[in-house]
């Protein structure tokens, strides 16, 4: 936007030189001014396109990040809901293993039950 030569007020208040009274404005002066106005509008249009492209890119990135947050949140909720079941399942497996060890090894474990209780 540094290449912009005129503000809307500059255009509104532009005074053209009169070449001869009654013959109108100096054509070269008017043409030069209009050339500068056209350049400004081209610069505005390019900047507007760039900003629109950037805006579209940033919106797409925000949408993608929101999807990632939703997926992460969903996975977190699933993990949290599975965790109590998993803990209960692990405890159940440990109890079964302990019962099987008692049955297989019989009295050998009964004497050492107090020493191995920290393993459960």
Curated annotation (Swiss-Prot):
Q: Which Pfam families match?
A: DivIVA
Q: Which PANTHER family match?
A: CELL CYCLE PROTEIN GPSB (PTHR35794:SF1), CELL DIVISION PROTEIN DIVIVA (PTHR35794)
Residues in the signal sequence = none
Q: What protein name does the entry list?
A: Cell cycle protein GpsB
What stretches pass through the bilayer?
Answer: none
> Where does the record place it?
Cytoplasm
Function of the protein? Divisome component that associates with the complex late in its assembly, after the Z-ring is formed, and is dependent on DivIC and PBP2B for its recruitment to the divisome. Together with EzrA, is a key component of the system that regulates PBP1 localization during cell cycle progression. Its main role could be the removal of PBP1 from the cell pole after pole maturation is completed. Also contributes to the recruitment of PBP1 to the division complex. Not essential for septum formation.
Q: Name one GO cellular component term.
A: cytoplasm
Chain segments carrying region Disordered: 69-90
Q: Which Gene3D superfamilies match?
A: 6.10.250.660
Self-association state and partner proteins as the record states? Forms polymers through the coiled coil domains. Interacts with PBP1, MreC and EzrA.
**Which family is annotated?**
Belongs to the GpsB family.
Q: Which Gene Ontology BP annotations are present?
A: cell division; regulation of cell shape
Identify the coding gene.
gpsB
Q: Which InterPro entries match?
A: Cell_cycle_GpsB, DivIVA_domain, DivIVA_fam
Compositional bias (Polar residues) spans?
71-90
Residue stretches in coiled coil? 34-74
Which UniProt keyword terms apply here?
Cell cycle, Cell division, Cell shape, Coiled coil, Cytoplasm
């Amino acid at each position: 936007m540094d290449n912009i030569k005129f503000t809307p007020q500059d255009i509104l208040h532009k005074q053209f030189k009169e070449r001869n009274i009654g013959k109108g404005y100096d054509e070269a002066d008017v043409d030069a001014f209009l050339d500068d106005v056209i350049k400004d509008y081209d610069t505005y249009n390019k900047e507007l396109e760039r900003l629109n492209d950037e805006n579209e890119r940033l919106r797409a990135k925000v949408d993608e990040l929101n999807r990632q947050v939703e997926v992460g949140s969903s996975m977190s909720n699933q993990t949290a809901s599975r965790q109590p079941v998993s803990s209960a399942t692990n405890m159940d497996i440990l109890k079964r293993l302990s019962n099987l060890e008692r049955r297989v090894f019989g009295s050998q474990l009964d004497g050492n039950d107090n020493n191995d209780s920290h393993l459960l």
